């Protein structure tokens, strides 16, 4: 059972819809009345300004036509003549003042200080933001080199050659000159033939002594152990394999053949 539309606070209720429409109509009427008052005030101000201007224009001939010796019934104005003749009033250059005003307005617009009523932030800027520019105009003036230009520069052999030449020039400039280089030590004089011969004889004598000592050690072991045993060819009678101490390996036990019956 759908009872939601039956609620009094429902937005689609007939009473609420009618109330909203009535409020909208009242708001439109109030807006129209406000605009009418603004227009009426502007019209009255313009009319008053024109009336004052007409009075000032007609007051000068009346003063000239009046007798200067006749006493006036109003208060005495000592500065009337100066104001009428525009004397003593500093006059500025209108063009210069207008130019200064435009320059100040341009600076304030560039800084974002001066914004008019109803003007958005994008309109206040001198140049539209990047997200409002069309695709073609975004890429027309990129801040840096484009990807295609980077690839061309990387694959250009002339650019590569210039880079290597610049490195070579830099290394040659950083390398010290011949005068600044430290003088290398002169190589020693080659040894004489007698010295080389003596060294060779000394090495040969040392090798010969080492070989004789080795042979003497082997012969001494043979004399102590006696005659060297002949190498056994039978696999069953050979000693067990011992990599480090073959003399300590024992023979396998000999098996006596069984007599045949």
UniProtKB/Swiss-Prot annotation:
SMART domains in the cross-refs: Cir_N
Keyword Phosphoprotein among UniProt keywords: yes
Taxonomy, superkingdom: Eukaryota
Annotated keywords: Coiled coil, Phosphoprotein
Residues modified to Phosphoserine: 59, 242
PANTHER family: LEUKOCYTE RECEPTOR CLUSTER LRC MEMBER 1, LEUKOCYTE RECEPTOR CLUSTER MEMBER 1
Protein name per Swiss-Prot or TrEMBL: Leukocyte receptor cluster member 1 homolog
Species the sequence originates in: Mus musculus
């Amino acid at each position: 059972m759908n009872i939601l539309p039956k609620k009094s606070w429902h937005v689609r209720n007939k009473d609420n819809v009618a109330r909203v429409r009535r409020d909208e109509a009242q708001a439109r009427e109030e807006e129209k009345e406000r605009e009418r008052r603004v227009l009426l005030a502007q019209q009255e101000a313009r009319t008053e300004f024109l009336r004052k201007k007409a009075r000032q224009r007609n007051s000068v001939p009346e003063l000239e036509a009046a007798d200067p010796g006749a006493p006036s019934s109003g208060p005495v104005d000592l500065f009337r003549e100066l104001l009428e003749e525009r004397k003593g009033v500093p006059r500025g250059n209108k063009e210069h003042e207008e130019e200064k005003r435009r320059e100040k307005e341009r600076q304030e617009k560039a800084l974002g200080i001066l914004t008019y009523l109803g003007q958005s932030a994008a309109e206040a800027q001198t140049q539209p933001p990047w997200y409002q520019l069309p695709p073609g105009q975004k890429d027309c003036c990129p801040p840096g080199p484009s990807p295609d230009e980077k690839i061309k520069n990387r694959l250009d052999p002339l650019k590569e050659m210039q880079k290597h030449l610049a490195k070579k020039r830099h290394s040659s400039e950083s390398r010290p000159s011949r005068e600044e280089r430290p003088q290398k030590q002169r190589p020693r004089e080659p040894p004489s033939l007698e010295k080389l011969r003596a060294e060779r004889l000394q090495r040969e004598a040392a090798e010969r002594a080492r070989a004789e000592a080795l042979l003497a050690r082997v012969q001494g072991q043979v004399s102590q152990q006696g005659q060297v045993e002949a190498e056994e060819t039978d696999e069953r009678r050979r000693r067990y394999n011992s990599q480090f101490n073959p003399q300590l390996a024992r023979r396998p036990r000999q098996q006596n053949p069984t007599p045949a019956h």
